[in-house]
């Protein structure tokens, strides 16, 4: 039974039914199935994010590090730009006075701009929670829709595949702090449109729709789109190698429409892309070093799952938000079984090849097993410095293996339950349970965030800020971005020196770095916070402090009591030549 092969990249036509009543019944059944799938996916997403939803006022996803603070700031700044009719692509509310190129910072304008009213009314934490919930549930439903329509699989098998795509270990991991890698529901839509054009021919409607969807995905996340495009390209090549008779009809149907859709997408996002690469505070490339998966990451269970709780493996993850693989060995074994079982099906072969290819790429330049370097070079070594992929984290290519594995399971599940042999459905159901139950996600850990000092939340800061900036001690940076939240709670009413973003580290090569270009005073204050000791302040350091405050356009310097407070306060006193005053929970130096 290999008829499912004909529905993946060659969707068959269906004759209209002459029985209106039967058709209406079928539509109602389909709608109920779709509604049930959407409801189930939404409930699972709410379960995963329950801690955040229960505490929208002060809850913070523990494993996000400083990323949640950064993303909430992105949402708040977009809403501020919309409300004040300002250019959302650049903001000087961080990194004053140079500002931040937000198009070069994955600010997700495709989401942050439409949700600006919600951000303005309820705050960026609500927008953050909506984005993650919508991302998980929407991505699961979009893949379910694709599998049930384009592949032609049963609703049950399609729901299984959609759930795997929407709640895969990598999705749950990124839900801690990377909504741009969670809101992926447009990717299956792109697949559906491309497949429809290739199979049934182009129309103006399809071409325009594809261009619009690609443009919107660019404004949601370019890196996931690039990874997806590479993986889909691998799938298509392998598929047509196995089904060469379908290649020429697909080429004839697509050769005009796909380029036109690409041109339309580029025209729509031409200015934002120009701003990203050539606008103020743009950068040439972001060097991230070796970021490949340890081979054990492919076979172990994810930390935030039932399997990870009861059978944790060696800690080989990059960080809590980058568990991009962690498929678990049972799922890999089941995927292999499905690939062998369906080997005569061209789409199954293509899915298997795609999963293997992107899985190998995700391992990086050198094979690492259990943190041991084997010195065995892998394909990423040869492509890591090529244009477009040079700034991609190679570990994230593992995310593209998920839809491929899901397709294998969808096709195999559909075949198992249509086979007619009674032992097969039962055996396959047991195998699915063994592979997928350990991957069931656990709720993301949520903690209380440190309250915003009353100095900012009460509006007292207005008595100390004219047209200049607020300099916090230490300055906001990737290691501690809490001042971004203070700024949000103050209504985005003042700019901050420093910040957490990606910007150029120099004006020549424009190599990117996280955070602001380090000025002498910022480095000094960071060092004092870490050491807890007061250095001997020199005249040069005092001169540097005056120059830095002038560069930052500082009106007030603010220190919240915490780690190394005494040392930091004494250091700033000596740098400025006068003491601080304590007011509304903070130490302040008025430097106007």
PLM regions with names:
Residues 66-81, 254-257, 261-339, 388-398:
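Periplasmic/ER-lumenal interhelical loops and adjacent helix-loop junctions
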Residues 44-139, 168-184, 295-315, 369-381:
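Membrane-interface coil-to-helix junctions
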Residues 2, 433-592:
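Extracytoplasmic
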Residues 237, 327-362, 414-415:
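Hydrophobic, aromatic-rich transmembrane alpha-helices
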Residues 1-54, 256-263, 340, 346-354:
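Start-transfer (signal-anchor) and selected internal transmembrane alpha helices
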Residues 34-43, 212-213, 236, 248-274, ...:
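Hydrophobic alpha-helical membrane-interfacial segments at the cytosolic entry of transmembrane helices
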Residues 41, 132-150, 155-241, 258-269, ...:
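Membrane-embedded helix bundles of polyisoprenyl
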Residues 61, 174-181, 294, 315-319, ...:
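Membrane-helix boundary/interfacial segments in multi-pass membrane proteins
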């Amino acid at each position: 039974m290999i008829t499912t092969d004909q529905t993946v990249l060659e969707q068959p036509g269906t004759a209209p039914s002459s029985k209106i009543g039967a058709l209406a019944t079928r539509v109602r059944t389909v709608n109920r199935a779709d509604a049930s799938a959407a409801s189930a996916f939404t409930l699972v997403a709410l379960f995963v994010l329950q801690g955040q939803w229960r505490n929208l006022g002060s809850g913070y996803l523990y494993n996000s590090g400083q990323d949640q603070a950064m993303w909430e700031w992105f949402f708040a700044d977009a809403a501020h730009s919309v409300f004040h009719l300002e250019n959302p692509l650049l903001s000087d509310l961080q990194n004053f006075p140079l500002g931040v190129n937000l198009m070069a910072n994955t600010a997700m304008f495709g989401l942050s701009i439409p949700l600006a009213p919600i951000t303005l009314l309820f705050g960026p934490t609500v927008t953050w929670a909506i984005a993650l919930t919508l991302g998980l549930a929407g991505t699961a439903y979009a893949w379910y829709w694709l599998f049930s329509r384009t592949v032609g699989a049963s609703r049950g098998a399609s729901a299984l595949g959609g759930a795997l795509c929407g709640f895969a270990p990598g999705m749950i991991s990124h839900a801690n702090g990377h909504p741009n890698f969670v809101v992926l529901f447009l990717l299956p839509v792109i697949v559906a449109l491309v497949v429809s054009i290739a199979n049934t021919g182009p129309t103006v409607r399809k071409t325009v729709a594809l261009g619009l969807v690609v443009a919107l995905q660019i404004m949601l996340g370019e890196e996931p789109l690039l990874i997806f495009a590479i993986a889909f390209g691998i799938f298509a090549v392998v598929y047509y190698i196995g089904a060469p008779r379908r290649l020429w009809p697909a080429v004839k149907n697509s050769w005009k429409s796909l380029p036109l859709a690409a041109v339309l997408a580029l025209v729509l996002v031409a200015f934002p892309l120009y701003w990203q690469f050539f606008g103020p505070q743009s950068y040439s490339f972001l060097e991230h070093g070796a970021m490949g998966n340890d081979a054990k990451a492919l076979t172990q269970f994810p930390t935030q799952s039932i399997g990870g709780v009861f059978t944790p493996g060696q800690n080989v993850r990059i960080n809590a938000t980058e568990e991009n693989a962690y498929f678990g060995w049972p799922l890999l074994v089941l995927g292999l079984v499905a690939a062998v079982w369906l080997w005569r099906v061209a789409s199954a072969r293509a899915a298997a090849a795609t999963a293997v290819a992107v899985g190998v790429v995700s391992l990086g330049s050198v094979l690492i097993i259990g943190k041991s370097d084997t010195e065995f070079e892998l394909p990423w070594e040869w492509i890591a410095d090529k244009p477009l992929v040079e700034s991609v984290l190679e570990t994230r290519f593992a995310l593209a293996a998920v839809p491929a594995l899901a397709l294998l399971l969808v096709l195999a599940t559909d075949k198992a339950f249509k086979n007619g042999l009674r032992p097969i459905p039962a055996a396959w159901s047991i195998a699915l349970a063994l592979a997928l139950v350990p991957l069931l996600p656990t709720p993301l850990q949520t903690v209380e965030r440190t309250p915003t000092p009353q100095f900012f939340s009460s509006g007292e800061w207005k008595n100390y800020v004219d047209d200049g900036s607020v300099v916090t001690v230490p300055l906001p940076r990737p290691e501690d971005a809490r001042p971004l939240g203070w700024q949000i709670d103050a209504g985005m009413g003042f700019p901050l020196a420093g910040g957490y973003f990606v910007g150029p580290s120099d004006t020549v090569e424009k190599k990117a770095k996280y955070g602001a270009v380090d000025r002498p005073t910022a480095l000094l204050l960071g060092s004092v916070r870490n050491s807890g000791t007061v250095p001997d302040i020199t005249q040069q350091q005092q001169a540097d402090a005056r120059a830095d405050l002038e560069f930052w356009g500082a009106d007030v310097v603010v220190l919240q009591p915490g780690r190394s407070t005494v040392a930091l306060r004494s250091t700033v006193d000596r740098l400025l030549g006068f003491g601080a005053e304590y007011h509304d929970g903070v130490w302040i130096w008025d430097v106007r």
